[in-house]
């Protein structure tokens, strides 16, 4: 087996590298080229990059396409740019807007990986005769003894991106490779300099790529003018406390920007899109113990329907560490349910809940799903309050 767990020697193995124009994917292309693989670089143009060409912290924009092409020239590998704007708009941006209108807090990077990068790009790699698609994500995969691959948290905990990749299917995972999963970020930048790549000191992408300076509400309002429908801000008992200019300006757990005069700090507890109401309450009302998941993607052994009550660790936000929980299967509703052993604040519908085998820094990713606003979620908040 070669370094990618593939049977042929590197010079007989074609690998497509998804090149975003950043340092991570550029280093992946450089490392594989240096090892002798037949490397082909592909960059996706995902949105109208005119306004974002010179914006720092974005990805897949005009500057990034230029950088990816320059890296490919330095490495001496073929490079293709594909226009995926229409697919990205339909699969990611439109869904992002609809999710916010429904009172949810979506994670567009998860949907982009699931619906665009790992579906369409993987198919393209196969069409190009590649035996693997490699990316610059910080996540690890290892061969299973029985076949296929398993997903694990990255070596560098500060860079671990497993939260955003839980929706990778077993079939996709078998074809994908993540060469940076066992490397720290500092080593990646050092390798970029060693390889002579101009992007060695380029800043990492931070924002949602199609949202300038984090102003997601402006993007949604432009796509869906009805999103700015005003409404009431009420307390847990339904008493009117103030007004707002659209629920898209709020998310569960938010405190700033409420502009309310109250004797205690108030937080957004839930959003009611049907009535255009923002419900606020004390911090205790944010505590959630039970979560129901839809769109479950299962990467563990067996079928999710066979889960009785399994101890796991879950992450409900990308910035939080996995916490102990119990996972079970609700046969009546055909969905997974998670019971948090310690209540979590600010759990929002639309976010991802990622399931790990345990809370070890290198734990296996068992899968995950989308958190939905249902009775069980609100009941958990009420119990904690």
Swiss-Prot record:
Site positions (Interaction with tRNA): 137, 351
Gene name per UniProt: mnmA
Gene3D superfamilies: Adenine nucleotide alpha hydrolases-like domains (2.30.30.280), HUPs (3.40.50.620), Translation factors (2.40.30.10)
Keywords of the record: ATP-binding, Cytoplasm, Disulfide bond, Nucleotide-binding, RNA-binding, Transferase, tRNA processing, tRNA-binding
Principal subcellular localization: cytoplasm
Name used for this protein in its record: tRNA-specific 2-thiouridylase MnmA
Residue positions of the active site: 112, 209
Pfam family, one: tRNA_Me_trans_M
Annotated GO CC locations: cytoplasm
Binding site for ATP: 18-25, 44, 136
Organism: Methylorubrum extorquens (strain PA1)
Keyword Nucleotide-binding: yes
Function recorded in the entry: Catalyzes the 2-thiolation of uridine at the wobble position (U34) of tRNA, leading to the formation of s(2)U34.
